[in-house]
């Protein structure tokens, strides 16, 4: 596998995406501002530039960062091992510093399985140019059939939590820069906009649905009015 390539097959993806845009009809219904998950992703605001993020990487002082609730044995193990470490910042409870500053100040951002695998952490870390480290066995990550996850993220088995620092330090500076550059290439696919933008998170989810259009089957009475 070519770890420099962020797509499994970019040409097929681009052609299929064009066909999806041409043939797939999408109707968007507005949500209320207080709906669950309405504000789960970080606001776009002014997006950090690629050059700025690479320069910040050269000054990132923390090896790795995690902050979150201790709601699973995996997170509990992470905190037990690394809570007081000087290079891996593993934190539970309220942060004393802004969350974005921690993402900007860390080389690797830990995505640790909680009561569910899927959170906004991967999108957050990519947004700020922090290489995601996924610590969760038997997981299904977003867009895995489109994106080459190994080109911009690291997978660590939960049993290897005590070896986390050793694993991360195996990556040379050049290898880390390759991972980070690839992370910046794919971050557009994980970003959410109030009005969808081509290839953003909304369109990528629609593309995933479009790919599975022939495998989704609904009962014949699904659209029959009860009256």
Where are these regions (language model features)?
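Short amphipathic alpha-helices within nucleic acid-binding modules
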Residues: 166
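Acidic donor-binding helix in nucleotide-sugar-dependent glycosyltransferases
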Residues: 124
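Nucleotide-sugar donor-binding catalytic core of glycosyltransferases
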Residues: 1-120, 128, 134-155, 162, ...
């Amino acid at each position: 596998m070519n770890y420099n390539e962020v797509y499994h097959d970019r040409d097929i993806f681009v052609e299929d995406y064009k066909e999806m845009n041409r043939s797939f009809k999408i109707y968007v219904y507005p949500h209320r501002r207080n709906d669950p998950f309405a504000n789960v992703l970080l606001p776009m605001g002014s997006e950090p530039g690629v050059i700025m993020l690479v320069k910040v990487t050269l000054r990132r002082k923390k090896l790795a960062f995690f902050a979150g609730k201790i709601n699973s044995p995996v997170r509990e193990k992470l905190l037990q091992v690394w809570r007081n470490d000087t290079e891996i910042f593993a934190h539970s409870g309220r942060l004393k510093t802004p969350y974005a500053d921690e993402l900007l100040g860390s080389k690797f951002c830990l995505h640790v399985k909680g009561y569910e695998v899927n959170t906004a952490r991967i999108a957050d870390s990519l947004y700020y140019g922090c290489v995601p480290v996924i610590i969760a066995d038997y997981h299904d990550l977003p867009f895995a059939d489109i994106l080459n996850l190994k080109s911009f993220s690291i997978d660590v088995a939960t049993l290897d939590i005590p070896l986390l620092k050793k694993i991360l330090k195996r990556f040379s500076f050049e290898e880390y820069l390759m991972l980070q550059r690839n992370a910046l290439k794919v971050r557009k696919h994980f970003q959410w906009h109030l009005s969808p933008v081509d290839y953003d998170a909304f369109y990528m989810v629609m593309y995933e649905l479009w790919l599975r259009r022939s495998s989704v089957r609904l009962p014949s009475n699904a659209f029959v009015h009860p009256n």
